[in-house]
Amino acid sequence: MSTEQTFIAVKPDAVQRGLIGYIISKFELKGYKLRALKFLVPSRDLVEEHYAEHKGKPFYEKLVGFMASGPVCAMIWEGKQAVKTGRLMLGASNPLDSAPGTIRGDYGIDLGRNVCHGSDSIESANREIKLWFQPSEIQVYDRTIEPWIYE
């Protein structure tokens, strides 16, 4: 079975609103395996490196300040097409453009407070995972439920 990993972060707005459990539940119920989780207030340096591709854009400084303003729940999820499906589960970056049933569609209203981050490519996922987690923090384990999820 071929799987991949994606990086998902519950942003400070969603942490304050008590949405961590809901977001974790969505990924678990989909059948994805949680490989790592940490709860932290990220440093400004970490957030700047994470969003380096957006440096110089009008929203960059506000985004960095927001992401470093409070606790974030950073996670690694694994499964078939985890990056693509994870993004579909989150919904469009602008919550007002997100379909009902998606995380942002159900719980987001404003682009600047869009509840969560999800890797947009396998390459981004690999970079973000290395940025946020040490290899020793990533758990390797078998789930007995796997045959009930994958052929």
UniProtKB/Swiss-Prot annotation:
Catalyzed reactions per annotation: a 2'-deoxyribonucleoside 5'-diphosphate + ATP = a 2'-deoxyribonucleoside 5'-triphosphate + ADP; a ribonucleoside 5'-diphosphate + ATP = a ribonucleoside 5'-triphosphate + ADP
Any GO BP: GTP biosynthetic process
Disulfide topology: none
Gene3D superfamilies: Nucleoside diphosphate kinase-like domain (3.30.70.141)
Alphabetic keyword roster: ATP-binding, Kinase, Magnesium, Metal-binding, Nucleotide metabolism, Nucleotide-binding, Phosphoprotein, Transferase
Required co-factors: Mg(2+)
Known EC number: 2.7.4.6
InterPro entries: NDK-like_dom (IPR034907), NDK-like_dom_sf (IPR036850), Nucleoside_diP_kinase (IPR001564), Nucleoside_diP_kinase_AS (IPR023005)
GO cellular component, as recorded: cytosol; mitochondrial intermembrane space; nucleus
Residues annotated as catalytic: H117
A GO MF term: nucleoside diphosphate kinase activity
Family statement: Belongs to the NDK family.
Quaternary structure and interacting proteins, as annotated: Homotrimer.
The protein's name: Nucleoside diphosphate kinase
Organism whose genome encodes this protein: Schizosaccharomyces pombe (strain 972 / ATCC 24843)
Lineage: Eukaryota, Fungi, Dikarya, Ascomycota, Taphrinomycotina
